[in-house]
Amino acid sequence: MELNNLKPAAGAKHAKRRVGRGIGSGLGKTAGRGHKGQKSRSGGFHKVGFEGGQMPLQRRLPKRGFTSLTKEFVGEVRLGDLEKLPVDEIDLLALKQAGLVGELTKSAKIIATGELKRKIVVKGLGATKSARAAIEAAGGSFAE
């Protein structure tokens, strides 16, 4: 095999279809665009989602939900993540240093996902009822 002898597989390449070049080509006269109408004209296109003047689907459906402005300031931490932390006293600063919450986070809440088997002390963080129960069952406590 030599680089100057490489060829594409048979049938892999197709000549570009030339339109508007006579009856014999099969795509002469109207060049495959049919007769008249918006789509046959030069520049004849419509916006994506335009339904011919009918109220578009996107506007017929109701708006839902909103974007919370406080989302980036409130963090969630799993019990399983706390298990991996090397420190026993857990507060917002420890979570930021471990990269479990973002730098902009102003408050965090512990949720009961995963397992906690060691004793920890939680300072200044919220927790769900089940997360609080799991921490206390493992011998941990909450210091406000």
From Swiss-Prot:
Molecular function GO labels: rRNA binding; structural constituent of ribosome
Keywords of the record: Ribonucleoprotein, Ribosomal protein, RNA-binding, rRNA-binding
Any one GO CC term of the record: cytosolic large ribosomal subunit
Transmembrane regions: none
Bias kind Gly residues: ranges: 21-31
Source superkingdom: Bacteria
A GO BP annotation: translation
The keyword Ribonucleoprotein appears for this protein: yes
Disulfide bonds, paired cysteine numbers: none
Region of interest (Disordered), residue spans: 1-56
PANTHER family reported in the protein's UniProt record: 50S RIBOSOMAL PROTEIN L15 (PTHR12934), LARGE RIBOSOMAL SUBUNIT PROTEIN UL15M (PTHR12934:SF11)
Family: Belongs to the universal ribosomal protein uL15 family.
NCBIfam families referenced in this protein's UniProt entry, alphabetically: rplO_bact
Job of this protein: Binds to the 23S rRNA.
Subunit structure: Part of the 50S ribosomal subunit.
Designated name of the protein: Large ribosomal subunit protein uL15
Organism: Burkholderia multivorans (strain ATCC 17616 / 249)
Gene this protein is translated from: rplO
